[in-house]
Regions:
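Short, well-structured N-terminal submotif of metal-dependent ribonuclease cores
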Residues: 1-38, 51-58, 133-149
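Acidic, PIN/NYN-like endoribonuclease modules and their adjacent C-terminal/linker elements
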Residues: 2, 98-149
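A generic structural signal for short hydrophobic patches within well-formed alpha-helices
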Residues: 10-11, 43, 80, 116, ...
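Structured helix-beta-strand junction loops
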Residues: 32-33, 69, 86, 119
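Conserved beta-strand segments of alpha/beta enzyme cores
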Residues: 35, 71-73, 122
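Short beta-strand scaffold positions
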Residues: 37-38, 74, 110
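Acidic catalytic patch
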Residues: 62-87
Length: 149
């Protein structure tokens, strides 16, 4: 399964934030069970934030490690224009959704599911995605909430 990881998911790991255990469990499955993708524009932001917190050398090492298990979703001019038309409050999230469409992702994994309600690709938290995989009978709707069916 193809998963686009929102930047906040990668930052969970980089900065060992509270959601990091579930994120690490999900990432451990990437390469074996799932294919992880990152939006092209996320890489620069991740590098900048890691460098700011640590060092340029650590930022490059982190990005190199990241690119060892995640692919990069590249978008085009038309994708950015399309993202402008999606009913999403944050344009950066719309660009994440455009990257998810471009790489053929089935889900966007993020900490802010609510901001992806207008996305053409459903969004889930790492915890919700792992719970869904543990319970295959769970059906996920477009908004990332389990349905009653």
């Amino acid at each position: 399964m193809r998963l686009l990881l929102d930047i906040n998911i990668v930052l969970d790991v980089a900065f060992q934030r509270p959601g990091e255990p579930a994120t690490s469990a999900l990432i451990a499955r990437c390469g074996r069970e799932h294919q992880a993708w990152l939006a092209w524009h996320s890489i620069a932001t991740i590098a900048y934030l890691v460098e700011r917190q640590h060092s340029a050398q650590m930022a490059r090492a982190f990005i190199r490690g990241l690119l060892g298990w995640a692919d990069v979703a590249v978008t085009q001019h038309a994708d950015a224009l399309q993202a402008l038309d999606w009913p999403m409050p944050d344009f950066e999230d719309a660009l994440q959704a455009a990257a998810a469409v471009a790489c053929g992702a089935q889900f966007i994994i993020t900490r802010n599911v609510r901001d992806f309600s207008g996305s053409p690709i459903p969004a889930l938290t790492p915890e919700a995605f792992l719970a869904q995989k543990a319970s295959p009978s769970a059906v996920v709707t477009q908004r990332g909430k389990p349905s009653a069916t």
